[in-house]
Regions:
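Extreme N-terminal leader/anchor segments
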Residues: 1-70
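Aromatic-lined, polymer-binding surfaces characteristic
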Residues: 69, 78-246
Length: 379
């Protein structure tokens, strides 16, 4: 272990992160089956952006690895693969039927007593949003038993908010509580979610509309879910808080995206994970939003383009210094396209597992820049 590296990293953590790292080990919140207090729901009315095809009726495909269902706790392909299975994104993929989706929801509910992975806060958050979208699309599948399970999972999420990580994880928690409580018409939960969401958007979305973890892929993911919040919510909070932030984020995406509609693979970014920019723009238009490109500034990226040349350069520092989990040591790295085709590319990422491969992909040596004195630029 490199003690100096550990100390230089820990020095940037916030006191709340340290405190909640301890608390979550001492006090482990348990799942409790509860009855949803409301019998009415408020479904989304605008069609969301479609999810990538990850389930073919027999096998799941996540992170370029295919396998059949072997239980919710199947970590043979790594924890992130198991997380993806528990997100249940495939409920929102094209071609998903009401009967097939309901069957998987019922199977999940039946298996909850032995499901360890699926009751981690991040999978709860993403799954809750997917369930709301599915129930909005197929209202007859929103039975009392399934709503009770959704409500119980959201109540567990309230007790397991990811203050030990902060960053996009806590923002996703806020999104889920906001969308879930809007659907279930739970005013208490909705008020708490609105306050948390307001604080996190204020902190995490930079002045030029970029998400502060500086990953174009995560920017698309978080913008898509912000649009989901606008779809689920209503009133002054949506109009005065959510929509202005969404417009700014849309303007940033418009500025950073390449002419062919793809994103630069900077920091933790890969293809086939987030909704495509075109799908996000179409979703925003269905919600009645209008935006214009926002000049790249605080995000640290600069884009140069003319008829034949497009270049994106990273000239900034790490913004979320207390949560650099999706950041790479890529200072002054760049991508270059000539005649609309990739010429100098970033390698992107292939894994989140704690392996030498993960460390290499985040290092300066893996990017289009120089290594000085054998050290990554983060050092």
């Amino acid at each position: 272990m490199n003690i100096g590296l550990v100390l230089r990293t820990v020095a940037h953590l916030r006191s709340a992160q340290v405190l909640f790292q301890v608390l979550r080990r001492v006090h482990k919140a348990r799942f409790k089956a509860l009855a949803c207090p409301s019998v009415e729901v408020k479904p989304m009315v605008v069609e969301p952006a479609a999810k990538w095809q990850s389930y073919d009726g027999k096998r799941f495909a996540f992170l370029n690895i295919e396998d059949e269902f072997r239980g919710w706790n199947n970590t043979a392909h790594g924890m992130l693969w198991a997380y993806n299975q528990n997100y249940m994104d495939w409920l929102c993929q094209p071609g998903m039927t009401a009967a097939e989706g309901a069957r998987w929801i019922d199977r999940f509910i039946a298996d909850m007593p032995t499901n360890r992975v699926g009751l981690d806060p991040y999978p709860i958050a993403l799954r809750a949003i997917n369930w709301v979208k599915f129930f909005s699309r197929f209202p007859k599948e929103s039975t009392a038993e399934r709503r009770d399970s959704l409500y119980s999972q959201l109540r567990l999420l309230e007790r397991k908010l990811e203050y030990h990580l902060l960053g996009n994880h806590l923002l996703e928690d806020a999104y889920a509580l906001y969308i879930g409580s809007a659907y279930l018409k739970d005013s208490r939960m909705h008020g708490r979610a609105s306050r948390l969401l307001r604080r996190q958007l204020r902190e995490q979305v930079l002045s030029d509309g970029a998400h502060y973890e500086q990953s174009p892929m995560y920017h698309c993911i978080l913008l898509d879910r912000l649009l989901d919040c606008i779809n689920a919510g209503e009133g002054e909070f949506a109009d005065l808080v959510l929509k202005p932030v969404a417009v700014r984020m849309l303007g940033h995406l418009e500025s950073i995206v390449y002419a062919d509609g793809t994103i630069p693979l900077l920091n933790d970014s890969a293809e086939g994970i987030a909704p495509e920019p075109a799908a996000i723009f179409a979703y925003a238009r269905r919600l009645g939003l209008q935006w214009t490109p926002v000049a790249l500034g605080e995000c640290g990226y600069r884009k140069f383009d003319n008829t034949d040349v497009e270049a994106v350069v990273d000239v900034g520092n790490i913004k979320a210094s207390y949560q650099p989990g999706h950041t790479h040591a890529d200072s002054l790295s760049f991508e270059l396209r000539l005649g609309g085709k990739p010429f100098v590319v970033d390698s992107g990422i292939s894994t989140y597992d704690k392996t030498p491969r993960r460390q290499l992909e985040r290092s300066t040596a893996a990017h289009n820049t120089v290594v000085l004195a054998g050290k990554s630029s983060s050092e």
